């Protein structure tokens, strides 16, 4: 019992060390559509308060945005605009929760929500957490998520989200 308690405490300390509470930084995004092979490059500014407010405003292409304010998700991307209530749209609810959990360092919950297993690797001063769905991916869920943190300060530097439909978004966080 004592050994299990020590392992659990060590795991919780590891999660806390790599939990990023807030962001106010620039980012780049590479979107790859596996079916068509089309690649799109984007860039912008990301602000995350550590809870349930995320704002991604794009400078390339200018005018695009992705915003989470509580349960509201506002999107203006790729010529499509939408204001969605995540509580009413299950697919949006899962995507919202996964993004917020990954940004806040709560990757274990993201794995549970996406019916996934996790693995952790550390090399060259970076810690990479891979989250890979097992079996059927929940509607709106991610087939895989890869999070890369700097070991020195626990800051998230890269996030790769692969949707079940074959779209891969790679975010490099400055």
Give the ranges of each region predicted by the language model.
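An acidic-aromatic
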Residues: 46-98, 169
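Sec-dependent N-terminal signal peptides
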Residues: 6-10
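Flexible, processing/modification-adjacent segments and terminal tails
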Residues: 20-32, 38-39, 78-135
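Short, surface-exposed coil-to-beta transition loops
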Residues: 40-43, 61-62, 69, 140-145, ...
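Gly/Pro-enriched, hydrophobic low-complexity segments
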Residues: 120-174
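Positively charged n-region of N-terminal signal peptides that target proteins for export
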Residues: 1-4
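Polybasic/polar functional segments that serve as interface/processing modules
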Residues: 21-35, 39-47, 59-60, 74, ...
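N-terminal signal peptide c-region/cleavage motif recognized by signal peptidases
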Residues: 14-16
């Amino acid at each position: 019992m004592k050994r299990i308690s020590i392992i659990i405490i060590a795991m919780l300390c590891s999660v806390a060390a790599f939990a990023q509470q807030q962001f106010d930084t620039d980012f780049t995004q590479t979107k790859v559509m596996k079916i068509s092979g089309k690649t799109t490059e984007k860039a912008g500014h990301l602000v995350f308060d550590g809870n349930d407010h995320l704002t991604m405003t794009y400078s390339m292409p200018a005018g695009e945005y992705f915003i989470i304010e509580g349960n509201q998700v506002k999107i203006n991307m790729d010529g499509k605009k939408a204001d969605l209530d995540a509580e009413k749209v299950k697919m949006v609810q899962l995507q919202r929760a996964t993004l917020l959990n990954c940004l806040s360092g709560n990757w274990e919950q993201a794995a549970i929500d996406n019916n996934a297993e996790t693995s952790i690797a550390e090399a060259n001063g970076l810690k990479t957490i891979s989250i890979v769905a097992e079996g059927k991916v929940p509607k709106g869920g991610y087939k895989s998520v890869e999070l890369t943190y700097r070991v020195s300060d626990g800051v998230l530097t890269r996030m790769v989200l692969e949707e079940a439909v074959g779209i891969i978004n790679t975010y490099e966080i400055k």
